[in-house]
Amino acid sequence: MAGTKIELDVQSTGLVIVDMQVEGCERHGPGVKPVIANIRGLLDRFRAVNGKIIHVQSVRTKDHPEFTVFGRPYGLLLGSPGADFVEELRPLAGEEIVQKTSHDCFYKTSMEAVLEKLQLQACRDRIVVTGIGSSNCVYHAVIGFHIRNYTASCPKIAFMAFILSHNPSRCTNFVPMLTTSM
């Protein structure tokens, strides 16, 4: 699918950076570096105009069902180095962080309160979603915003999937793919 150029109004647009954490980025290997750089470019543009930025952080505790029920190896443990944001995309003081314990950045999180605090409104504002894991967490974020009546977009240069065959096909069915950052 060809990208769509969309002009963004920083006052009515939020940048959501999903799961750009050490552990996940290491799993994706060197191919993630251009994605990190492209997200950083968007982040710098939003920061330069005092834009609305939300960092989403996936964290777990040792009693999480992923480990206790499904037997997965421990990962993204709260407070562990792997759960930290990658250095290039670390939040600055005052930038919002939403911690989540599932693929969904809305389920049992502060996302709704953060959107209200930033005065981002459904049926009016656009959300630009970036990150890795487009077949999981980015996908669920886009769907979460979509079902809440936000216009959600994924810059095709600023997300990727662990299973490359899923990138970007899963998101293109639901949202416009931006060809430019802003």
Predicted regions and their residues:
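Short acidic, Gly/Ser-rich segments with clustered Asp/Glu that frequently serve as metal-coordination loops
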Residues: Q21-R27
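Active-site loop signature of alpha/beta-hydrolase-fold enzymes
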Residues: E23, T61-K62, A161
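Generic enzyme active-site microenvironment
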Residues: I17, Q21, H55, P155
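Active-site-adjacent betaalpha module
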Residues: M1-G14, G41-A48, Y74-M182
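Short glycine-enriched, charge-decorated loop/helix-capping segments at active-site entrances
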Residues: H28-P34, F70-L76
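…and closely analogous acidic/polar surface helices at protein-protein or active-site interfaces
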Residues: G29-R47
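Short aromatic-enriched loop/helix-cap "lid" or pocket-rim segments at secondary-structure transitions
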Residues: P65-V69, N167
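Von Willebrand factor
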Residues: F46-P65
